Amino acid sequence: MKFRFLPLFLVFFFVCFSGQGFKEPPGVVIDHLSKSTEKYIGSPAICVLPDGSYVASHDEFGPRSAEFYSAITHIFVSRDKGKTWQKTATLDGQFWSNLFVHQGMLYILGTNKHHGNIVIRKSTDGGLTWTQPYDATHGLIVEGEYHTAPTPVVVHNGRIWRAVEYATGKSSQWGKRYSAMMISAPVNADLLKAESWTKSNSLPYDSTYLDGKFEAWLEGNAVLTPDGHMEDILRIHAPNLPDEYCAVVNISKDGKKASFDSKDFYRMPGASKKFTIRFDPVTQKYLSLVNTIETGYEGKTSTDRIRNAVSLISSTDLRNWKIEQRLLFHEDYRLHAFQYIDWQFDGKDIVFVSRTASEDNNGDAHSAHDANYMTFHRADDFRTLISH
């Protein structure tokens, strides 16, 4: 038998361009957008339905996206615990949104565009079809300019709570325009009606915070403290500081007043990037999955741009945080990232989704920030990872 040998340049061509010359990111790929589209994957969110199905979503941002006039969000469903996913819906006019179940119904809450109105939609069939938020009785709940991210809703004291940021300020500059605030509604109210929702006052940017190094607070989490008070815990953008901080804003029982003491900044690993905090009633600890800055990466760039590691962290008091276990890591931080993690408990496991930047069959991602994948991950038996 004779063997025919291909010229070396053809071997190189087939290896590099056959679609097999790159390694897919870890986890299960839910969706992918090539950088050639000039659309990037943002705002990953996940929810576990009462029947055990998973629903996930992401939006699109970037030069060729519709983020500034009527943003697009895609909905996906998995009925096999995240092994496979099917796209079930595309929502026109939905951005920066989280998914949640309330009284057996599935909701998505965010804005209609970049710095848009706050809108909410309901699905009664597990994410296949959704209501349209076209007026104040059908999901257009707060008009104006607002900012948010896939952060949690919390039910407490007969109300459902969600942190957002007012995005009209003295400055139109990113970060400086954001004011911390909370919205809430009675648990038995019609969440699609604007009249059901109460807004707190908004707390604006203050250049004197953190000895003048404060540049923004954003992407707040509604969190119930150990002693039963509602707080808005926010990501802090302070790129000229070596440490990462969160801010803790106090919310009154009726949801109408937000207040802040300039001493209420606390060191928190990963808090210069978006995070989601949830309480685990079994361990009696608050948990989050955050972008830690690993040894050797300190000072390579501003803290908010280092997103190549995901770690489980815990706290008993929301003031002191401990890194428990690294879950994901890539040695490169410029073109690789696992970011904007949203997560849920599922029995003994944590399930989470990531806005992931990694190479694909078109080469590298546009940047670590401009992600080309949404990926699904599972932390098995997560309580064994937590120190006691």
Regions found by a protein language model. Name each.
Residues 1-23:
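Bacterial Sec-dependent N-terminal signal peptides
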Residues 273-274:
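Alpha-helical scaffolding within the catalytic cores
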